[in-house]
Amino acid sequence: MTGGASKLRSASDPVAAIGELGGERLRERMRAVETRLLEISACHGDARRTIEAGGKRLRPLLVFVAGLDGPADAPLVRAAVAVELIHSATLVHDDVLDAAPLRRGRPTVYARAGRVAATATGDLLFSRAFAELAANGSVEQLRALSAASTALSEGELVQRADAWNPGVTIERYLRRCELKTASLFEAACKLGAAAGESADLRGFGLAIGTAFQILDDVLDVTGPVERTGKARGTDLLDGTVTLPLILARERDPRLGRLDLRAIDDAGEVCDRIVASGATEAARERALGLVAGAKAKLPDELGPGQRRALELIADGVALRFA
């Protein structure tokens, strides 16, 4: 395999690449997370199916890489499990709010069992996350996860408050990204560093988490339903103002005059957003955040830990390429 192809594979599958870099100890930790997630979710069918649907497990990976040289395995595993449970809970709740039929190629809990069951399933995963982390006996870690959970909820409320509002600024949008998405990346870094007695990586987590959300919003405009689990332009139809739309309204006078409540053909509007260059501009902004996060990694990191974090950042960027 050529060097370029190897680099591409590493960035597109950071879990596998970092597993090779971190050795058997890291692979054992990731396997322990999967085992514990299945144990916790076994009590309820919808919860278990949510966990079994899988995912990249980027947030647990961040916990482990942030605490890569830490002496203890069990506290790191519990922290990683707690973060992934919170993430899974938010996905279940998001599917209720979006009335999403698919998640990771499978029917959502909402589509299969309805709003009440999906809401209860998300609540269960949330509560089990805090129970898991409490076993570490660290008030500092519980505060970090609580702050992230509060931020997630605040971000959702800000998004609802801003619905259909064409005056949403880039600054307000980015703050919403930090609350709704990046706060959990930030918490993963803080929990890993706390359990592993490592350098503070919260700024790294916040930057790549914000980039992750921007790129996800780009994908809503450009991506097919087979990849996203929802129709193109779902954010438009929900009245959710994202960076591609904000930038497109500045570039295209027709989009600047668009009444969001009067959209008949979301696909056509998406095409106009793409044609304006707004999706590419939004993507470049996200990639700038990724590059900045890598450039600002603390000097005291070891070469293995630094490379692992760079791989995670590259994986976020390439996932949406």
Residue ranges and their predicted role:
Residues 1-88, 92-111, 159-167, 226-227, ...:
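Conserved N-terminal diphosphate/IPP-binding helix and adjacent helical/loop segment
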Residues 15, 19, 26, 30, ...:
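Hydrophobic packing residues in well-ordered alpha-helices of helical domains and bundles
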Residues 30-34, 86, 93, 123, ...:
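Hydrophobic faces of stable alpha-helices that mediate helix-helix packing
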Residues 44-88, 125-128, 170-208, 244-246, ...:
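Alpha-helical phosphate/pyrophosphate-handling elements in metalloenzyme active cores
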Residues 51, 103-125, 167-181, 225-251, ...:
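Divalent-cation-assisted or electrostatically stabilized phosphate/pyrophosphate-binding catalytic cores
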Residues 52-56, 119-120, 134-225, 231:
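All-alpha helical catalytic cores of prenyl diphosphate-utilizing isoprenoid enzymes
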Residues 67-71, 192-199, 219, 223, ...:
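C-terminal helix-coil-helix/basic helical segment that borders enzyme active sites and/or dimer interfaces
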Residues 95, 131-132:
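Glycine-rich phosphate-binding loops that contact phosphosugars or nucleotide phosphates
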